[in-house]
Amino acid sequence: DSHEERHHGRHGHHKYGRKFHEKHHSHRGYRSNYLYDN
């Protein structure tokens, strides 16, 4: 997702931690988690 990458890059979940990432992107649902976990 280009929008996600522009917003904070693919390393966003590493920088802030998975808990923060999931909470921050809760509106994106599991789709966001799947993309970032891989």
Swiss-Prot record:
Q: For bias kind Basic residues, which ranges apply?
A: 8-30
Keyword presence, Phosphoprotein: yes
Keywords of this protein's UniProt record, alphabetized? Antibiotic, Antimicrobial, Biomineralization, Fungicide, Phosphoprotein, Secreted
Q: What is its main location?
A: secreted
| GO CC entries | endoplasmic reticulum; extracellular region; mitochondrion
One of the GO BP terms on file: biomineral tissue development
- Segment Disordered: which positions? 1-38
| Compartments, as annotated in UniProt | Secreted
Residue positions, PTM Phosphoserine: 2
Lineage top rank: taxon: Eukaryota
Its biological purpose is as follows: Histatins (Hsts) are cationic and histidine-rich secreted peptides mainly synthesized by saliva glands of humans and higher primates. Hsts are considered to be major precursors of the protective proteinaceous structure on tooth surfaces (enamel pellicle).
Family listed: Belongs to the histatin/statherin family.
Q: Which protein are we looking at?
A: Histatin-1
